[in-house]
Amino acid sequence: MTSVVVVGTQWGDEGKGKITDFLSADAEVIARYQGGDNAGHTIVIDNKKFKLHLIPSGIFFKEKISVIGNGVVVNPKSLVKELAYLHGEGVTTDNLRISDRAHVILPYHIKLDQLQEDAKGDNKIGTTIKGIGPAYMDKAARVGIRIADLLDREVFAERLKINLAEKNRLFEKMYDSTPLEFDDIFEEYYEYGQQIKQYVTDTSVILNDALDAGKRVLFEGAQGVMLDIDQGTYPFVTSSNPVAGGVTIGSGVGPSKINKVVGVCKAYTSRVGDGPFPTELFDEVGDRIREIGKEYGTTTGRPRRVGWFDSVVMRHSRRVSGITNLSLNSIDVLSGLDTVKICVAYDLDGKRIDYYPASLEQLKRCKPIYEELPGWSEDITACRSLDDLPENARNYVRRVGELVGVRISTFSVGPGREQTNILESVWSNI
């Protein structure tokens, strides 16, 4: 029984897809356990970029099984489009499995997402308007439609009529918006269900059978710990649990079967949308990092907010996700800076604190306390070991590991697979 969970430790966009793709080479099953098509991940293979939103990164290994678990909310329209995209690129999807217990995102979820966001005015949380939150709301309210329901014509029709009647009352009475028509949704989405039917199964059986047989299973999270609905910067969070604990709920695999948790982070910090960001940069250094790091959302295209590495955030993520190994990405983006900074603590009303406050009001008053390190001017994109790095870059990597309190297993100096360097195999000693 061998399993590894990959989680983002910041606000998403840490390079989880790249690391999952890298670790997939030694895995036999790769599974997603939460989120939806609001999260994008980019994989570079032979200098060609592939952008995915729903399908696990492991799909590019045709001999390995890729799983969309029950904790994922699936937009069938987006999924069919993504399948067509992969087929057009010559990628087989015969190795894909989709949980029959996963919930479905429908047009009324997306419409409600937009209406709710617009109604917030200046208090918007920066949702991607993909219907993720409303779909999870329906799931919690026990009125959601699951993949198993989508495949049954009569069941789907009955539940769609009930849900649509309720949502239309909401649209008309509360938001003064036009209702949606049953006929505009039913046939289209039922057909999407038929197109994905070949992939649908009880994925908890596949995952547990694989683990019981001693196979290596890799779990791929979406977003990041700081976007977790319980442990993140609430309410500026997603509607699911990206933390490692979300694996057990979102995949149907018990906690006793999880061996290691790899936390993925960048050598700096970024986030999309609104919400607290203590180390955010508003100067030329921030602009430089954004442009060199190509910090624009995979899903939205929005410019990401960027800032210095925050070890307070990272220690919070380590604690709530039980991180055992760290993968440090995008070190190359910091090349050329005279000085690099790491936030080691916060100043809250004149008092030094080492924890991440839950209160948004306290976070607004938190000022980062920085440790400054000398930068490096060398191009490090061809470095293939820690010893290859310039001394200052090497010291930066080591200091990050010390402050977070987790050993660094891999570090990357660019987007390519060959630019990911192993310091310690996460598959060993399990």
UniProtKB/Swiss-Prot annotation:
Principal location: cytoplasm
Subcellular location: Cytoplasm
Listed cofactors: Mg(2+)
Biological process according to GO: 'de novo' AMP biosynthetic process; IMP metabolic process
Residues holding substrate: 298-304
InterPro entries: Adenylosuccin_syn_GTP-bd, Adenylosuccin_syn_Lys_AS, Adenylosuccinate_synth_dom1, Adenylosuccinate_synth_dom2, Adenylosuccinate_synth_dom3, Adenylosuccinate_synthetase, P-loop_NTPase
A GO MF term: GTP binding
EC number: 6.3.4.4
Pathway: Purine metabolism; AMP biosynthesis via de novo pathway; AMP from IMP: step 1/2
Keywords: Cytoplasm, GTP-binding, Ligase, Magnesium, Metal-binding, Nucleotide-binding, Purine biosynthesis
Reaction equation(s) it catalyzes: IMP + L-aspartate + GTP = N(6)-(1,2-dicarboxyethyl)-AMP + GDP + phosphate + 2 H(+)
Coiled-coil regions, chain positions: none
Residues noted as binding GTP in the record, renumbered to the chain: 12-18, 40-42, 304, 330-332, 412-414
PANTHER family: ADENYLOSUCCINATE SYNTHETASE
Function: Plays an important role in the de novo pathway of purine nucleotide biosynthesis. Catalyzes the first committed step in the biosynthesis of AMP from IMP.
Protein name per UniProt: Adenylosuccinate synthetase
